[in-house]
Amino acid sequence: LRLVTDAYEPGSVFKTLVAGAGFDLGVVRSSTSFEVPASIKVGDDTVTDADKRDYTMTMDVREMMRRSSNVGFVLVGRKIGADDFAAYVDKWGIGHSSGVDFPGESLGIVKERDQYDGATLGSMSFGQALSVSPIEIARAVGGIANGGVMMTPHFYKSSKGDEKDWGEGERAISEDAASQVTSCMQTVVSEGTGVGGAVDGYDVAGKTGTAERADENGGYLKENYMSSFMGFAPAQS
């Protein structure tokens, strides 16, 4: 199953985990506002938003999530700081086995804190400069849905009436932080980039991701993207 054995750059789906870290630390809340420029330097690179849209404005974190602003999340990442950012990447289980009961799980490529360069924090803040398996991201986002507690994923074929012991899970962020992320993700689906993920009769929380594909010769391929959506329902704000 490729969601276990393959790794990819998660792109903007990763912003949910960055927001969760910021909320948990208390350095930002969903209502915290930033003056967001049209572009920002990350190491030697200049980061813009998708299609070079100019989102120069005052934006709070909820609006950054709704618009999926790369530039905005670079600012959030800087607010968190490299040391805490790396610690929360670890707390989210990124770069570690999810524990799924299927062989061949890819751990992707995730830099340790002492491997960070001038571009790492900024790039990872919007889901580049790392690769992960979809099951890792699903486990982490499932933790948001579960009030901040991540569970070990399993392939479950059917129930024969026996009660299953799924364990207690592993807390990544506080329940309040998870609630804030969930609320932002609901806004993404109701009026943001994720409106296509809406389902009639369900309150859906979700986040879109559009990642540039890495070039085997270095850098990224132009006009070549990988799109994704990660969400859950019913959402509890």
Regions found by a protein language model. Give the residues of each.
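Beta-lactam-recognizing serine transpeptidase/beta-lactamase-like catalytic domain environment
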Residues: L1-S12, L17-S237
